[in-house]
Amino acid sequence: MMWWALWCAVVVAAGSGVAAAPAPDSLSPLDMVQMDSSAPDDETLYAMSPMAARYSAGAPWLYLLADMPRDSQTGSGRVKRRMPSLSIDQPMSVLRQKLSQEMERKQQAFRAAVNRNFLNDIGKRGFQWTPSVQAVRYI
């Protein structure tokens, strides 16, 4: 934990030393009075953003940003994929539904077989007229 505090102190000290000394090849400072006109002329009215009403004429960066084309302001670093996110919820619910339908079909077939056997044992279906079949049946 101590190294982190030491690192922060070194970065702050180095930053203050760099900011105090002007660079030899630096640009000349901007004349803010020239850019800060209280009444913009008709040519720049189209370039004023809707935020210009909120900020007074003391914000010349609004004019500079409004003059830039819109596509240059957006970063084209990463292209977002347009596919929907992958999820297993829908396929799993479909599989669960198919499994429950298959189990219900098997239970229905089993119940139909039990009913068929029950109906074969009672009434006319269960009575055999030939004695040889009855003898084989009960032996």
Curated annotation (Swiss-Prot):
It comes from Agrotis ipsilon. GO terms for biological process: neuropeptide signaling pathway. This is Diuretic hormone 41. Residues 1-20 form the signal peptide. Keywords: Amidation, Cleavage on pair of basic residues, Hormone, Neuropeptide, Secreted, Signal. It holds the Pfam family CRF. Residues 21-79 form a propeptide. The lineage of its organism: Eukaryota, Metazoa, Ecdysozoa, Arthropoda, Hexapoda. One of its GO terms (molecular function) is hormone activity. It is found in: Secreted. Belongs to the sauvagine/corticotropin-releasing factor/urotensin I family. GO terms for cellular component: extracellular region. Its main location: secreted. The modification Isoleucine amide is found at I122.
